[in-house]
Regions:
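Coil-to-beta-strand transition motifs
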Residues: 7-13, 23
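A generic structural motif
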Residues: 20-23, 141-143
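A short beta-loop-beta micro-motif enriched in histidine and acidic residues
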Residues: 29-32, 128
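Active-site/ligand-binding surface loops and adjacent short beta/alpha elements
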Residues: 25-27, 35-109
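Short, small-residue-biased leader/transition segments that mark boundaries at the very start
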Residues: 1-6
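Non-heme Fe(II) oxygenase catalytic core, chiefly the N-lobe of the double-stranded beta-helix
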Residues: 11-15, 30-31
Length: 162
């Protein structure tokens, strides 16, 4: 495995590369866990996932489809979208848009525990859950990466702020 990060004034690029140096094939799952600080999770929206299919982890990974509108947060959200599209996080409270571009990824994970779920899993205490959202490139579940001997796979995510 190798991880590489590079940045300039406008962007941050993260790449996670796995190489099968063994003699037998294997599968693995990966996600580039990015937790963005937001002004108020109930006031932000994610665009780029409209009409994408997803599995809802808050409901036993039930298959769903995102309506033709932005993802918003009015309760617990734990979704694995089958989408390679770039995503934009719009946060008017902080006056910014974060652009998330991905490659080597068949999925996008979106997560915020909300209350009371965040308290139950002890991942988010007090009101901290109101001020972050996770939006990340992923290769998991049925989209796990299979590597034959000698093969490599790179999962890359590039973030930029406007």
């Amino acid at each position: 495995e190798s991880d590489v990060c590079s940045s300039d004034l406008d962007t941050l690029t993260m790449t996670h590369t796995v190489t099968n140096t063994g003699a037998t094939p294997f599968s693995y799952e990966a996600a580039l866990h990015t937790y963005f600080r937001v002004s108020d999770v109930s006031q932000i929206r994610l665009t780029g996932l409209e009409h994408a299919h997803y599995e809802d982890a808050t409901n036993g990974f039930a298959p769903c489809e995102q309506p033709g509108e932005a993802v918003t947060f009015d309760g617990p959200v734990d979704r694995v979208y089958a989408s390679t599209a770039a995503v934009e996080l719009h946060d008017e409270g902080f006056g910014r848009t974060i652009h998330v571009a991905k490659s080597g990824s068949a999925q996008t994970v979106v997560w915020n525990p909300a209350e009371p779920y965040g308290v139950l899993v002890n991942d988010s205490v007090n009101e901290e859950w109101r001020h972050f959202v996770c939006c990340e490139a992923a290769a998991c579940r049925e989209h796990a990466v299979r590597l034959e001997p000698g093969e490599s796979h790179a999962l890359t995510q590039t973030l930029s702020v406007a």
